[in-house]
């Protein structure tokens, strides 16, 4: 009888262990909804931006697309710096919260025409803090040997991204066009606000994921320093946006060859800066480690080169993908019949 009881206990324990092996961390739900609402707010605002600039602020088509291009380009650029600042100073969780708050402010600033550049600056910097740290925070939820659960977790995480991106144009886009532009932007802001509230309420479910040692995610005792960083970042991004808009009439006077030469010169300057900073960091690292240890091995260089090759194709893909918020939106607005199952009374006569 005792053997049967022991076997039953072992069977129950094995069943529970199997369930636990496939059960995702509770923190994944928090990140899932935070990312879903962030993507809802981003794609909701993106679906309205170009149409709002042209139909409400009387921008020309070229100027509206230029501003949209600047905004989108900086949205993809700032996560590099946001991720670096989070790794070195803030920690992922605090950077995530800072980015979320900035985006809430940015979306509601879109309701005021005079605050357009400030709104875009807040959204860009907020995205820079938020976007890289959500993805990496998902990975921090799992321990060693949980590669299978981590892979499944990322699949669930990307379902949240797709769900938010799917709902945004249907809800925020419809409100913006049919009711009023500011209602659409406010809808995106409300979505981001829900994401922030849900993120704050779910902090305990994330455990120590994304935190530095002895760090409290909602401790902003160094608020003055943080405000200085964030304020300087927003001001710098706003200056870039305004600068591009200010110099765009002169850029239009350049020929295509001159524009290409200017772009190549800027790219060369960036590469020189990166190589110079890399050589400086390499020399500092070399002075601190034995000569027998190379900072980057041959196999690591091969992986870096592979990443750069893949990155070239990714850039081409996202360049085409982001036309959905610009040229494709204008094409759909001007050349697409969006009425279904409409009966024309004239056709009956």
Residue ranges and their predicted role:
Residues 24-72, 309, 318-331:
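Helix-loop boundary and gating motifs at the non-cytosolic
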Residues 101-117:
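C-terminal ends and interior cores of transmembrane alpha-helices
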């Amino acid at each position: 009888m005792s053997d049967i009881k022991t076997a039953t206990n072992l069977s129950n324990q094995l069943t529970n262990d199997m369930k636990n092996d496939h059960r995702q961390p509770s923190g994944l739900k928090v990140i899932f909804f935070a990312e879903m609402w962030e993507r809802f707010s981003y794609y909701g605002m993106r679906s309205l931006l170009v149409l709002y600039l042209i139909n409400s602020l009387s921008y020309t088509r070229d100027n509206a697309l230029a501003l949209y291009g600047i905004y989108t380009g900086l949205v993809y650029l700032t996560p590099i710096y946001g991720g670096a600042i989070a790794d070195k100073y803030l920690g992922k969780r605090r950077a995530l919260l800072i980015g979320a708050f900035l985006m809430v402010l940015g979306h509601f600033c879109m309701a005021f025409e005079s605050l357009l550049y400030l709104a875009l600056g807040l959204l860009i910097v907020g995205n820079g803090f938020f976007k890289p740290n959500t993805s990496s925070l998902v990975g921090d939820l799992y321990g060693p040997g949980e590669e299978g659960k981590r892979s499944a977790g990322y699949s669930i995480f990307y379902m949240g991204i797709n769900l938010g991106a799917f709902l945004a144009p249907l809800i925020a886009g419809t409100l913006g066009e049919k009711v009023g532009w500011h209602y659409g932007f406010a809808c995106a802001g409300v979505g981001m606000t829900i994401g922030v509230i849900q993120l704050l309420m779910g902090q305990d479910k994330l455990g120590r994921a994304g935190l530095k040692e002895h760090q409290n995610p909602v401790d902003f005792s160094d608020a003055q320093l943080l405000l200085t960083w964030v304020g300087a970042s927003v001001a710098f991004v706003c200056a870039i946006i305004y600068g591009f808009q200010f110099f765009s009439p002169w850029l239009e006077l350049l020929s295509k060859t001159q524009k290409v030469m200017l772009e190549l010169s800027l790219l060369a300057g960036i590469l020189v800066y990166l190589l110079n900073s890399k050589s400086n960091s390499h020399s500092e690292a070399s002075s601190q480690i034995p000569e027998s240890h190379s900072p980057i091995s041959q196999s690591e260089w091969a992986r870096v080169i592979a990443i750069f090759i893949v990155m070239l194709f990714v850039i081409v893909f996202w360049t085409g993908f982001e036309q959905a918020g610009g040229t494709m939106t204008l094409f759909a607005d001007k050349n697409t019949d969006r009425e279904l199952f409409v009966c024309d009374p004239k056709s009956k006569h």
